[in-house]
């Protein structure tokens, strides 16, 4: 270690003395600096994937002096190499089958006169692009109109010849899809459904009438089984209210001609309520009628149970004796 100069010394004397090697030329001691092109050529193998033979050649060319003179020729080929690889990968992807079908249908509708029906026109509107396919048709017509009159007769001749074989092909193609959907069977099921509705209405009416008849018979015979009704006699189940109403009507007609006319000229205001009650028999109300029916059913039930009870009593009394 060398001692530093005193702090009071001038700044020139404070500096350390230089080594003898420092007096040499600094450029001679430093290594030669490579240019950017050389460095790119040397590092190209790290970033660019090429064929095994091309990497060595590129490295040798970059190290030589020729690479410095023509730097634009070397980076071109490796930069273009990855592009075809991506194109190949895209071409290898399989297309969807539905996309192929759509493309074929679009081509068929564009080529020929496939717009015979409404369905074809709808499909054509769906598949046609925004004016791409419709643009060439008016252009050809405009060109034919704008042309000279001498060229007009010459153009339709050759144009008509290829048009003749082209038109039948799309017509046949359009006929095939039109024959596939069966339009006439559509209204047939509708007619069948209408017939079914009419039958269902008749069935409902018949069922309704049958239900009403069953309810009438049920209430007429008090809900008893047909065997019990036949045993008791159907004549006993006639509705008494009908007979009563008939009698009331006949009595009212008779009194209107005799009773009221007799007392109309007298001092009395007419037949009083007591006289009407005496002349017209009292009609049973619905509640009273139902009560009588319930009482009668209860007596019938008791009559059926009594023989069984008597038999059980006799059986129980025999061992006691």
From Swiss-Prot:
Q: Which InterPro entries match?
A: FAM110 (IPR025740), FAM110_C (IPR025741), FAM110_N (IPR025739)
Bias (Basic and acidic residues) occurs at 15-46, 131-145
Q: Which UniProt keywords apply?
A: Cytoplasm, Cytoskeleton, Microtubule, Nucleus, Phosphoprotein
Q: Which GO terms describe its cellular component?
A: cell cortex; centrosome; microtubule; nucleus; spindle pole
Q: Where is the composition biased (Low complexity)?
A: 169-181
Indicate where this protein resides in the cell.
Cytoplasm, Cytoskeleton; Cytoplasm, Cytoskeleton, Microtubule organizing center, Centrosome; Cytoplasm, Cytoskeleton, Spindle pole; Nucleus
Q: What is its main location?
A: cytoplasm
Q: Name one GO biological process term.
A: positive regulation of cell migration
Task: List the Pfam families.
Answer: FAM110_C (PF14160), FAM110_N (PF14161)
Q: Does the keyword Cell membrane belong to this entry?
A: no
Gene Ontology molecular function, alphabetical: alpha-tubulin binding
Please give the residue ranges the record annotates as the region Disordered.
1-84, 111-203
Q: Which residues carry this modification: Phosphoserine?
A: 241
Q: In which tissues is it expressed?
A: Detected in stomach, thyroid, trachea, adrenal gland and testis, and at low levels in prostate, ovary, intestine, colon, spinal cord and lymph node.
Summarize the subunit comment.
Answer: Interacts with AKT1; the interaction is transient and follows AKT1 activation. Interacts with PPP2CA and alpha-tubulin.
Similarity-based family: Belongs to the FAM110 family.
Its biological purpose: May play a role in microtubule organization. May play a role in cell spreading and cell migration of epithelial cells; the function may involve the AKT1 signaling pathway.
What name goes with this protein? Protein FAM110C
Organism the protein comes from: Homo sapiens (Human)
């Amino acid at each position: 270690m060398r001692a530093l100069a005193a702090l009071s010394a001038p700044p020139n004397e404070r500096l350390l003395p230089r080594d003898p090697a420092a007096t040499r030329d600094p450029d001679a001691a430093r290594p030669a600096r490579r240019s950017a092109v050389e460095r790119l050529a040397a590092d190209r193998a790290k970033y660019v994937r090429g064929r095994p033979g091309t990497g060595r050649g590129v490295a040798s060319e970059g190290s030589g002096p020729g690479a410095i003179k023509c730097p634009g020729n070397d980076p071109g080929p490796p930069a273009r190499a990855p592009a075809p690889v991506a194109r190949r990968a895209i071409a290898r992807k399989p297309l969807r089958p539905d996309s192929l079908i759509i493309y074929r249908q679009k081509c068929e509708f564009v080529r020929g006169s496939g717009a015979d029906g409404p369905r074809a026109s709808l499909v054509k509107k769906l598949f046609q692009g925004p004016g791409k396919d419709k643009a060439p048709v008016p252009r050809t017509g405009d060109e034919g109109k704008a042309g000279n009159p001498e060229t007009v007769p010459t153009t339709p001749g050759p144009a008509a010849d290829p048009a003749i074989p082209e038109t039948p092909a799309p017509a046949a193609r359009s006929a095939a899809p039109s024959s596939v959907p069966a339009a006439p069977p559509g209204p047939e099921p509708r007619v069948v459904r209408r017939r079914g509705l009419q039958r269902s209405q008749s069935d409902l009416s018949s069922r309704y009438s049958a239900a009403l008849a069953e309810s009438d018979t049920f209430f007429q015979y008090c809900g008893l089984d047909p065997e019990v009704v036949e045993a008791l006699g159907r004549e006993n189940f006639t509705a008494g209210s009908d007979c009563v109403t008939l009698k009331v009507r006949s009595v009212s007609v008779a009194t209107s001609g005799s009773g009221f006319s007799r007392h109309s000229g007298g001092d009395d205001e007419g037949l009083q309520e007591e006289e009407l009650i005496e002349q017209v028999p009292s009609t049973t109300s619905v509640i009273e009628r139902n009560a009588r029916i319930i009482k009668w059913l209860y007596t019938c039930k008791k009559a059926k149970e009594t023989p069984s009870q008597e038999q059980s009593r006799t059986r129980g009394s025999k061992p006691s004796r």
